[in-house]
Curated annotation (Swiss-Prot):
Swiss-Prot/TrEMBL catalytic activity: Hydrolysis of (1->3)-beta-D-glucosidic linkages in (1->3)-beta-D-glucans
Example of a GO MF term: glucan endo-1,3-beta-D-glucosidase activity
Family annotation (InterPro entries): Glyco_hydro_17, Glyco_hydro_17_plant, Glycoside_hydrolase_SF, X8
Protein name: Glucan endo-1,3-beta-glucosidase 2
Lipidation (GPI-anchor amidated serine): 477
PANTHER family associated with the record: GLUCAN ENDO-1,3-BETA-GLUCOSIDASE BG1-RELATED-RELATED
Length: 505
């Protein structure tokens, strides 16, 4: 009897320990993510950003900061997030453990695991854009990692920093590539840290920039992933490996540059890659068609899991630069790297036949009716009252305790009421006016479990999305929900064990 009780107590201890600690994320192979910049004159609300991500089935994003509003909106969505420490904060974090710990507490611990933060990007292209911060870069990375370690999150959240491929000298043939030796005092300890923590090297890969700077040496088709005949492929004379596109050659140059410093097992994560859809007069190849061609082919190439010629079959996950056109940036091409405009309309519709579902939805045919930005709240309330009264729509989902009650404000409730009325009239544009306080948008206003009429996410008016426990071999995650189901499973097992022991006794 004593041995049975001892066994039960031991099992209880092990199971409680297991349920208390999240497990490291499983390797999901190569994936496509998207960068989200905020240099827009009319930045969409975080709930609109998340609605667009959901509509396009984007499951991985990278932020250039740790915007709390967006991190809150991303909670319980299952979208995996890389957050960033801006370059102008590096000095403080690199010089002070406590500053790094406070940053992690405020921007990671406050949101995780509801928001699935997978990595912290410490600065961006620091060695080429902020040379005075180079001496503290590795210290900043280590201080952030130490703060994650103290919170038992170091196995769950990676720490790295994006490098520009301009640091790689003699990039072709790739087998001869090496990092700028003048920066080895920073790069060697950086790579040593990445290797010791099982992290990845973040690299920004832009065939467009290399193509522009090559003065015609790099063919356009080679930069765009377009098919080229075998006799036009680039051949590495040292390895006899053939390259059919610039992207693979640049990634392999990164692998070889690391190997030159005796680091051969650090994976590469491409944190930025893309092509502008407009440019200045000296950028004739910054066109809609070329941007569409490059990004469509990039997505197809990454998701085919072919890897690179040096490392075939090894995942090279990539984040497209970028989700929105950033109209406040200087220079025409800098304003036009986005896949979408601020209102959610696609700049172009990607050609992604047989390439999975990510970014494959044409949002141009999806329209919604929402409150016009800056509309008078009294007029909004009057229009809301009309829609729920004489307008004869079902407003029960925005009552207290129901699926669309939160956020509890007139704009959110008006959005639901206006859109429901609009869809009940068959998407009649005249129905989306409400005395001038409403307007039509292509951005899905659904949020959390509140799914609007016509949403690709569900298509039901204000009803909650079904949430079921993931299967034992599920490769997806849903933040707190998955932890909840896991905990329920643990306690179910404990209950069975206790009952069995009781029967034996």
């Amino acid at each position: 009897m004593a041995s049975l009780l001892h066994l039960l107590l031991l099992s209880l201890s092990l199971l409680v320990l297991a349920s208390a600690s999240p497990s490291p994320p499983a390797d999901e192979g190569s994936y496509i993510g998207v960068n989200i910049g905020t240099d827009l004159s009319d930045m969409p609300h975080p709930t609109q950003v998340v609605a667009l991500l959901k509509a396009q089935e984007i499951r991985h994003i990278r932020l250039y900061n740790a915007d709390p509003g967006l991190l809150i909106a991303l909670a319980n969505t299952g979208i995996k997030v890389i957050i960033s420490i801006p370059n102008d904060q590096l000095l403080g974090i690199g010089q002070s453990n406590s500053t790094a710990a406070n940053w992690v507490k405020r921007n990671v611990i406050a949101h995780y695991p509801a928001t699935m933060i997978t990595a912290v990007s410490v600065g961006s292209e620091v060695l080429t854009s902020l040379s005075n911060a180079a001496p503290v870069l590795v210290s900043a990375i280590k201080n952030v990692h130490a703060a994650l370690l103290s919170a038992n999150l170091d196995k769950l959240i990676k720490v790295s920093t994006p490098l520009s491929t301009s640091l790689i000298l003699d990039p072709f043939p790739p087998s001869q590539a090496f990092f700028n030796r003048s920066l080895n005092a920073v790069i060697v300890p950086l790579l040593s840290f990445l290797q010791s923590t099982n992290s990845y090297l973040m690299v920004n890969v832009y065939p467009y920039i290399d193509y522009m700077q090559s003065n015609g040496v790099i063919p356009l088709d080679y930069a765009l992933f377009k098919p080229i005949p075998p006799n036009k492929e680039a051949v590495d004379a040292n390895t006899l490996v053939r390259y059919s596109n610039a992207f693979d050659a640049m990634v392999d140059a990164t692998y070889f540059a690391m190997a030159f410093l005796n680091f051969t097992n650090i994976p590469v994560l491409v944190t930025e890659s893309g092509w502008p859809s407009k440019g200045e007069t000296n950028e004739p190849d910054a066109t809609l068609d070329n941007a569409n061609t490059y990004n469509s082919n990039l997505i197809r190439h990454v998701l085919n899991k072919t890897g690179t010629p040096k490392r075939p079959g090894i995942a090279v996950s990539t984040y497209i630069y970028e989700l929105y056109n950033e109209d406040t940036k200087a220079g025409l091409s800098e304003k036009n790297w986005g896949l979408f405009n601020a209102n959610g309309e696609p700049v172009y519709v990607l050609r992604l036949t047989n390439s999975g579902s990510v970014l494959a939805n044409d949002t141009t045919n999806q329209t919604y009716c929402t409150a016009r930005e800056g509309a008078d709240t009294k007029m909004l309330q009057a229009a809301l009252d009309w829609a729920c009264g004489p307008g004869k729509i079902d407003c029960s989902p925005i009552k207290q305790g129901e699926t669309c009650y939160e956020p509890d404000n007139v704009v959110a409730h008006a959005n639901y009421a206006f859109d429901t009325y609009y869809h009940q009239t068959g998407n009649n544009p005249d129905a989306c006016n409400f005395n001038g306080v409403a307007s039509i948008t292509t951005t899905d206003p659904s949020h959390g479990t509140c799914v609007f009429a016509g949403s690709r996410g569900n298509g039901r008016n204000g009803t909650s999305v079904n949430i079921t426990a993931p299967s034992a071999n599920s490769t997806t995650s849903s933040g707190i929900r998955s932890d909840l189901y896991y905990s329920r499973g643990i306690w179910s097992i404990l209950t069975v064990m206790i009952l069995n022991v009781a029967n034996i006794l």
